[in-house]
């Protein structure tokens, strides 16, 4: 089939009010991504030592009772996923979703999402909200964006991200989703993970993939088709201070990742009120998420290494082909190549 894209608003000049609304949409996502989890964790702790301590105790009891919910499908809210603020976030860059092939809802899928970028903006916008009409482009599919399991330990923030359909990137959680009797489950895994964020340099396309094979094993165990997904522009919305491999700064980043599960990055965007100053507002660079063709995978409860390596190689080839087919239409120079590490 031909390429299908999401419907975008007419490309007319934006009013000042529209520009402000888009900036608010982009900025609130950054602030939520960076600070909501730590803020509510600290708040719940501090309230224990005030007259409002019953609120913290009540929530901690609820947290104990609700502990396994993220690994059992979470609590998705279509009301949250359809809010207008996500359309403002979409229009700020803008973010587009491109469909290159049909994904029939009579089977399950494991979508490998690349690159991770700093904040996975394109993937959240396209798979965790309806701002680009995922359910219309892929009718019958139920998307799940798999993220760092540690995020679901953070009070209040865990409930917030569950409402988008986010789930822990853990075997227990993903096995639960792909074992549901209702087919059409589409698990989106950012294969490069937090380590790949260290290579989120504008203009570069470096993926941590050569040794990442867990997603292939997952697909084999459940007979779920593999689907390559590439988000052009994801690395371009922030500037990153990249440290040379082997430097003490890079060593500190890797050590921190081993301890905490994510890599601390030094990054910056533009100022909220001035495009020439530094700040946390991302640069308004177009993000185009291209969903590739499905790769049929047989079900193997105990896949061999040969089978894993075979389908991993097929996936890498399909991903590279997807990149080559769409890079020029997405503003990437023809001479640019995809790099796997």
Curated annotation (Swiss-Prot):
Keyword annotations of the record: Acyltransferase, Cytoplasm, Endoplasmic reticulum, Glycerol metabolism, Glycoprotein, Lipid biosynthesis, Lipid metabolism, Membrane, Transferase, Transmembrane, Transmembrane helix, Ubl conjugation
Pfam families: DAGAT
A biological process from GO: triglyceride biosynthetic process
EC numbers: 2.3.1.20, 2.3.1.22
PTM (free text): Ubiquitinated. Ubiquitination leads to proteasomal degradation.
Tissues in which the UniProt entry reports expression: Selectively expressed in the digestive system. Highly expressed in the ileum, and at lower level in jejunum, duodenum, colon, cecum and the rectum. Not expressed in the stomach and the esophagus and trachea. Expressed at very low level in liver.
Cytoplasm among keywords: yes
UniProt family annotation: Belongs to the diacylglycerol acyltransferase family.
PANTHER family per UniProt: 2-ACYLGLYCEROL O-ACYLTRANSFERASE 3, DIACYLGLYCEROL O-ACYLTRANSFERASE
Name of protein: 2-acylglycerol O-acyltransferase 3
Species name: Homo sapiens (Human)
């Amino acid at each position: 089939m031909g390429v299908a894209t999401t419907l975008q608003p007419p490309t007319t000049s934006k009013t000042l009010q529209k520009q402000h609304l888009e900036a608010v949409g982009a900025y609130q996502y950054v602030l939520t991504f960076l600070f909501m989890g730590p803020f509510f964790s600290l708040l719940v702790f501090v309230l224990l030592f005030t007259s409002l301590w019953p609120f913290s105790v009540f929530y901690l009891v609820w947290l104990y009772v609700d502990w396994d919910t993220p690994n059992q499908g979470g609590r998705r809210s279509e009301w949250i996923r359809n809010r207008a603020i996500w359309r403002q976030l979409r229009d700020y860059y803008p973010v587009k979703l491109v469909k290159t092939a049909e994904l029939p809802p009579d089977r399950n899928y494991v979508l490998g999402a690349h690159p991770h970028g700093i904040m996975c903006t394109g993937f959240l916008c396209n798979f965790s909200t309806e701002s680009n009409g995922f359910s219309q482009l892929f009718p019958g599919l139920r998307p799940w964006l798999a993220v760092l399991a540690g995020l679901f330990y953070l009070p209040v923030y865990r409930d917030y991200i569950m409402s988008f359909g986010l789930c822990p990137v853990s075997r227990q959680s993903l096995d639960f989703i792909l074992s549901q009797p209702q087919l059409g489950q589409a698990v989106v895994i950012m294969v490069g993970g937090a380590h790949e964020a260290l290579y989120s340099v504008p203009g570069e396309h470096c993926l941590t993939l050569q040794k990442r094979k867990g997603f292939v094993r997952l697909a084999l165990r459940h007979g779920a088709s593999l689907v390559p997904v590439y988000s052009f522009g994801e690395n371009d919305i922030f500037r990153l201070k990249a440290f040379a491999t082997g430097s003490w700064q890079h060593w500190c980043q890797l050590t921190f990742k081993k301890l905490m599960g994510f890599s601390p990055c030094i990054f910056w965007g533009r100022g909220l009120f001035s495009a020439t100053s530094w700040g946390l507002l991302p640069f308004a660079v177009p993000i185009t998420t291209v969903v590739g063709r499905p790769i049929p995978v047989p079900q193997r409860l105990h896949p061999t290494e040969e089978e894993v390596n075979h389908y991993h190689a097929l996936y890498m080839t399909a991903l590279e082909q997807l990149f080559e087919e769409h890079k020029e239409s997405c503003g990437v120079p023809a001479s640019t190549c995809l790099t796997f590490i």
